[in-house]
């Protein structure tokens, strides 16, 4: 039987290590697709600080048997119940063990009142697209590119390839989407 996956809120003192671990996980796909990072870590420290401090944001450690194996930043809107998975990662050393899906299930269970989940990923991140669509049940709702810019991320160019991205949503059972 696999070890249990649990979630724990990150404390302010945890954020520097959380940031570093997230940036290491995100860098893998960018380096694989575009080569070495030229302009510092991705996402940038400033973007992560903004995500951590955003209204409704919750920073979560993903734990396997009490050991940190990843993290997530979610934005919870208790009024509309339309929530966002802003950032999600599994530590590279723990890839390929089914932890991502189990962690996502734990997030869904932590927020049972959610009507709709929203998330996004760069176009080149085929592994993420497969994960969200085929493993977690998200649907692609938009493809942002030079001819159809993302209205929620104007001018964001943190790293190569981010100018083309998919937006996803998952309508939870018993809910209807109202966008």
Where in the sequence are the language-model features?
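A short helix-loop-beta-strand connector motif used in the catalytic cores of GNAT acetyltransferases and
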Residues: 44-61, 70
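Conserved GNAT-fold acetyl-CoA-binding loop/helix
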Residues: 26-49
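Conserved acetyl-CoA binding element of GNAT-fold acetyltransferases
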Residues: 81-92, 120-121
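A short beta-loop-alpha structural element at the N-terminal edge
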Residues: 5-20
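Conserved acetyl-CoA-binding loop-helix of GNAT-fold acetyltransferases
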Residues: 90, 96-109, 134
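Conserved GNAT acetyl-CoA-binding A-motif
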Residues: 110-123
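Conserved catalytic-core motifs of GNAT/GCN5-like acyltransferases
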Residues: 120-121, 134-161
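Conserved beta-strand in the GNAT
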Residues: 61, 67-76, 84, 89
